[in-house]
A protein has these predicted regions:
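N-terminal small/polar loop signature for handling phosphorylated ligands or for N-terminal nucleophile
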Residues: 1-18, 119-127
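A glycine/threonine-rich phosphate-anchoring loop and its flanking beta-alpha core
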Residues: 11-109
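C-terminal intrinsically disordered extensions
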Residues: 89-118, 221-245
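Generic alpha-helical structural context detector
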Residues: 74-77, 133, 160, 222
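Generic hydrophobic alpha-helical membrane-span motif
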Residues: 5-6, 27, 62, 161-162
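Generic enzyme active-site microenvironment
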Residues: 2, 54, 154
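C-terminal charged capping/lid subdomain of soluble metabolic enzymes
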Residues: 84, 188-245
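Active-site segments that bind and position negatively charged phosphate/pyrophosphate groups
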Residues: 99-200, 205
């Protein structure tokens, strides 16, 4: 993404970063690290905080609305990612000190998004503002503890596997939505509720909409545990203890 290139350059050259997002499909415009892909593996490098972050609603509304709605993918993922962190902690596998207050903060963000779901689907100023404010709230939770465990988990790992398998990019929030749909079911984590919320928001997460063939998705799911085990930097999730068949 352009914002990741900008963050990387700002970090390397020690320059001020001015961020003016044109779509809200991912939270990268609010986070300090640059997401760099190396052989389809994602690495987060450096630190460049937007100074200032400029939100122009006219610019955002000029984009296809589905690209802004996609922004809720990295917020709805709190539902599955927080479950994964709680699960990992219960198994003594959490990579970080467990923070109940971080989990509770994530739940408040989800409630805020649920309360603004109609505006988000309408792509109006209140809906756009809700996504931006939720991203900022997420940062206030995650940056002090130096990780995004409440927002990234098994739902993101399916995306990583599919991206490596198919060797093509996706609209981030949409593919994360697919991960939420499937992994919330593996978790037995209120899947009908989170699916209803995604549907009400207008998030486009269906495989056919991303040209993901059934066989590719099935093979990705069957390979998911092996894929996760092969990546040293991926956190412990429900995938590690599940047999998908």
């Amino acid at each position: 993404m352009a914002i990741d290139v900008a963050k990387y350059i700002a970090w390397k050259l020690n320059k001020r970063l001015v961020s003016i997002p044109t779509i809200l499909s991912v939270d990268a415009f609010t986070t300090p690290a640059a997401g760099i892909r190396n052989n389809h593996d994602v690495e987060y490098l450096g630190e460049a905080t937007p100074d200032p972050l400029i939100i122009d609603y006219n610019v955002l509304r000029s984009a296809p609305k589905e690209l802004n709605i996609a922004g809720v993918g990295d917020l709805f993922s709190i539902h599955t990612a927080s479950f994964d962190w709680e699960y990992a902690n219960s198994r003594g596998k959490s990579e970080y000190p467990f923070k109940v207050e971080a989990i509770n903060g994530g739940k408040k963000i989800l409630e805020f998004i649920y309360d603004n779901i109609g505006n988000i689907k309408a792509n109006n100023n209140n809906g756009l503002r809700a996504i931006v404010e939720a991203y900022i709230s997420l940062n206030t939770i995650c940056l002090p503890i130096d990780h995004f465990r409440i927002e990234e988990g098994s739902e993101h790992y399916l995306f990583y596997e599919l991206e490596e398998r198919l060797k093509r990019p996706f609209i981030h929030g949409n593919i994360i939505g697919l991960g939420i749909y499937l992994l919330s079911r593996l978790q037995n984590n209120d899947p009908l509720f989170i699916t209803e919320m995604m549907n009400e928001s207008g998030l486009i997460y269906q495989p056919i909409s991303m040209n993901i063939k059934k066989d590719d998705l099935v093979n990705s799911l069957l390979n998911l545990k092996k894929f996760v085990k092969s990546k040293d930097k991926l956190w412990y999730t429900i995938i590690d203890d599940s047999e998908i068949n």
